[in-house]
A protein has these predicted regions:
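N-terminal alpha-helical scaffolds in RNA gene-expression factors, predominantly in nucleus-encoded
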Residues: 1-703, 707-731
Length: 731
């Protein structure tokens, strides 16, 4: 089964190294650095039964972290890349085994009399030995002696000789952790300002190919490039961005300059180079401007049939990072991706699903293709892939046709990888949240996640995000799985997260203009702030509601403890303006009022700017309002009931409200675009989960959807009151 697949990712040893002059031990005990590939070349995973992925799945999963990001360098129309980057495909005539042995013997004879030129020549020739001889050369003590002699007079080498030696090290696959590389890095750092741009980029490329981190060299290189960025030609620009991405960081000022160069050269870039640009900026945590992303989207949309899967995924990563919604690009993706997904690796598939989820863009054909392909590839999925896939479907609130198979397969693989998930608790919690959004509750996994051991592991760095995830998980299982009797979070942790979320809500959500306007008007309509509570009913769902309780007679019940009996509320409840008397009510209830009102309201004259249906209001909205309504509130029985109710307001402070079994509990939600999938009215996962749980707790969810409420914010107070009255009392 899936858990029997080997983990083909290599983990590099971090053991301490000996000094540069004791290289013999380094070579004796160091094995060649294995490529950090998902599946190393010419190596199949040992499948232990017939249920494992077949050959086609294996071929789709072959990925090299060294070679794949460098595909743009192989463009035949850009021969300039040959002088900027290392390539093992352009080997000259091989050195014979006999000649190699002779060279190593010469080292023992010449010893310290070896000149820099001879040493460089020896390394070059040894680097051209047949591949099957490389391991024996690395293990030879005479080769270790040659390495030791090479670092004794580094300053005497020419630039070309020093670069040639580094190139030989790459061919020989010297372990990146070898101690002599520290000495070589120092020497290259010393020479940066005297080397050409091509040589500097080539050296950086070889360090990357070796897998050696050289932060000091890159720091000086970037300083050099900040002064010469305007002189970069197109291949140099792309190669530099690639190097920056692999180094994971660069000065923001330099990235802004390079972005302007990308914009200048955009028409000349091919699709693979565009993918390299997006990946370089993405890996270094630098976004591209919306203007540039829209131009990139236009170009890739036109050529999407020709772009490689790898470059396409990299472009998607940048759209995800910048949150730019390029609808033409996304629609083209929906046409192309379903046919490509079966031939893509699981990482690429994950990034497509994750990008769609991050952009809140639901394309059912794309997500169906993902769901249909992944069950057969699940053995190749890392913990991160499982997490992002489950989160993507959950966040988009989408159930594919094969939902049961999809979720069962991925859940089973989570169980198989529990050991790996303990190293990455954030991925484990992301998996579970994705499942919970989709209303799947693997109780054994949830119990493990809420165990004291795992909670301690997940919160040891005091990461608020993981605490929030645990809180959401705990609150959800408590509401939706009453049969669950397993672990729960401690009261202390729940209180801590609740307070942090409430603090955020008070500072951000509760004070949004559209929320405040709704709260104020509802308070006015119901008779005071004691009837409306602007808070998070379910803190674990991370958003607020306007809570209102009505009795069976649709009269509001005071619930806001913070305002009940306060001086401010008492003053608000005093009669102001027109005194509501029996005479006034009799006049309002007069049998002739309908005729009078009909004459006054039937055809009101509207001033310019007071038209009832503005262009920003949906056409169907007018059905919600009284068609004869202009600037006043329609006199209805409900309104009269509310007016009459104000006469009975108690003179003494109200007592603390108590929960009533016969009350209607309303959760009024002011939604916005971020609660829905892009350009649709399909609710996202977290917000769907919240409504589901509120309803389970007996609340009636009343939504003020943004497509109705936001246009109304510019309308008259009377129109807003009428809309809110209709929403609340017809719910």
């Amino acid at each position: 089964n899936a858990k029997q697949i080997q983990n083909t990712y290599s983990i590099m040893s971090s053991r301490s190294l000996s000094s540069a002059k004791n290289n013999i031990l380094d070579f004796a005990f160091s094995s060649p650095v294995t490529s950090q590939a998902r599946l190393p070349d010419n190596t199949k995973p040992q499948l232990k039964n017939e249920a494992e992925p077949k050959l086609d799945a294996y071929e789709a999963e072959i990925y090299s972290t060294k070679e794949d990001p460098r595909r743009f360098q192989q463009d035949r129309d850009r021969p300039e890349y040959k002088s900027l980057c290392y390539s093992n495909s352009t080997q000259s005539v091989c050195t014979s085994v006999e000649e190699g042995q002779h060279l190593l013997k010469q080292v023992t004879f010449l010893k310290s009399s070896l000149t820099p030129g001879v040493i460089a020549d020896y390394f070059d020739k040894l680097g051209h030995l047949p591949d099957d001889q490389m391991e024996s050369v690395r293990a030879d003590t005479k080769f270790a002696m040659l390495c030791r002699y090479s670092i004794e007079n580094l300053q005497q080498y020419s630039h070309a000789e020093l670069i040639g030696i580094l190139k030989a090290f790459v061919r020989l696959e010297i372990p990146a952790t070898h101690s002599m590389f520290s000495v070589y890095e120092v020497e290259f750092c010393r020479r940066v300002w005297n080397m050409s741009t091509n040589d500097l980029l080539l050296v950086a490329d070889m360090w990357r190919y070796l897998g050696r981190s050289v932060p000091r060299y890159l720091e000086i290189l970037y300083s050099y490039m900040e002064l010469r960025w305007k002189d970069l030609n197109l291949p140099q620009l792309i190669q530099l961005i690639y190097i920056i991405g692999e180094g994971r960081k660069a000065p923001r000022e330099l990235m802004q300059k390079l972005e302007s160069m990308v914009l200048r050269h955009l028409d000349s870039l091919n699709l693979e180079e565009i993918g390299a640009v997006c990946l370089g900026f993405f890996k270094s945590h630098n976004g591209l401007s919306e203007h540039l992303m829209r131009k990139i989207g236009d170009k890739v949309s036109d050529g999407m049939d020709d772009i490689s899967n790898y470059a396409l995924v990299n472009v998607l990563k940048m759209f995800r990072f910048t949150h730019v919604d390029h609808l033409v690009f996304l629609k083209r993706l929906g046409q192309i991706a379903p046919g490509r997904i079966p031939s893509m690796g699981s990482q690429g598939i994950m990034h497509i699903a994750l990008s769609c989820a991050a952009l809140h863009y639901l394309d059912e054909n794309v997500m169906n293709a993902v769901a249909a392909t992944i069950p057969d590839r699940v053995a190749y999925c890392r913990s991160k892939d499982l997490a992002k896939l489950l989160w993507s479907f959950g966040a988009l609130n989408y159930q594919p046709p094969n939902a049961d198979q999809f979720y069962a397969t991925l859940t089973s693989q989570i169980r198989n990888k529990l050991g790996e998930f303990e190293k990455f608790p954030e991925h484990f919690l992301t998996c579970l949240l994705g499942l919970v959004f989709a209303k799947y509750y693997p109780l054994d996994l949830i119990e493990f996640a809420l165990s004291e051991k795992f909670v301690k592991l997940a919160t040891k760095e005091s990461l608020f995000e993981l605490k929030k995830d645990l809180f959401t998980l705990d609150g959800s299982v408590e509401i939706e799985c009453p049969e669950y009797t397993g672990n729960h979070l401690s009261m202390e942790l729940r209180q801590e997260v609740t307070e942090m979320l409430q603090s955020f809500s008070r500072q951000d959500i509760c004070i949004k203009p559209e929320v405040l306007e709704a709260a104020t008007l509802i308070e006015s309509m119901l008779g005071g702030p004691q009837y409306v509570k602007n808070h998070m009913i379910l803190p674990h769902t991370r958003s607020n509601d306007l809570e209102v309780h009505l009795d069976v007679g649709e009269k509001p019940i005071p619930i806001n403890v913070d305002t009940v009996g306060s001086p401010s509320v008492s003053s608000e409840l005093k009669p102001m303006g027109i005194q509501i008397t029996e005479d006034l009510l009799d006049q309002l209830l007069d049998s002739n009022r309908k005729t009078v009102l009909h004459k006054d309201v039937e055809k009101p004259k509207l001033e310019t700017g007071q038209r009832r249906v503005a262009s920003s209001v949906p056409k169907d909205y007018t059905k919600l309002l009284n068609p004869d309504f202009s600037s006043g509130v329609p006199i209805t029985d409900n309104l009269i009931s509310m007016l009459a109710m104000s006469r009975a307001l108690p003179e003494k402070p109200l007592c603390k409200p108590k929960a009533r079994a016969d009350a209607f509990k309303l959760a009024i939600q002011v939604s916005n675009r971020n609660h829905y999938c892009y350009a649709s009215r399909h609710l996202l996962g977290l917000h769907n989960l919240k409504r589901r749980q509120l309803q389970k707790l007996g609340y009636v969810v009343v939504e003020l959807p943004y497509w109705e409420w936001f246009p109304l914010l510019k309308r008259t107070r009377s129109e807003k009151l009428a809309y809110l009255h209709q929403k609340i009392f017809s719910s």
